[in-house]
UniProtKB/Swiss-Prot annotation:
One of the essential components for the initiation of protein synthesis. Stabilizes the binding of IF-2 and IF-3 on the 30S subunit to which N-formylmethionyl-tRNA(fMet) subsequently binds. Helps modulate mRNA selection, yielding the 30S pre-initiation complex (PIC). Upon addition of the 50S ribosomal subunit IF-1, IF-2 and IF-3 are released leaving the mature 70S translation initiation complex. It is found in: Cytoplasm. The keyword rRNA-binding applies. The lineage of its organism: Bacteria, Bacillati, Bacillota, Bacilli, Lactobacillales. Residues 1-72 form the S1-like domain. PANTHER family: TRANSLATION INITIATION FACTOR IF-1, CHLOROPLASTIC (PTHR33370:SF1). Disulfide bonds: none annotated. This is Translation initiation factor IF-1.
Amino acid sequence: MAKADVIEVEGKVTETLPNAMFKVELENGAEILAHVSGKIRMHYIKILPGDRVKVEMSPYDLTKGRITFRFK
């Protein structure tokens, strides 16, 4: 039930912040704060500024998100 109301968008990482947080600029121009999902953390996937990523956002708070995929 929780996955049904998730908004998925693509964006570009603009800045790295402490505690595995990132500033991500979305395709529509908005900038949000995103953290790394557990699977990315578990597989030691590095995310650097300039990377294109897929972000999941809750419809209740559109200023925060979770990075779920890093494009090659």
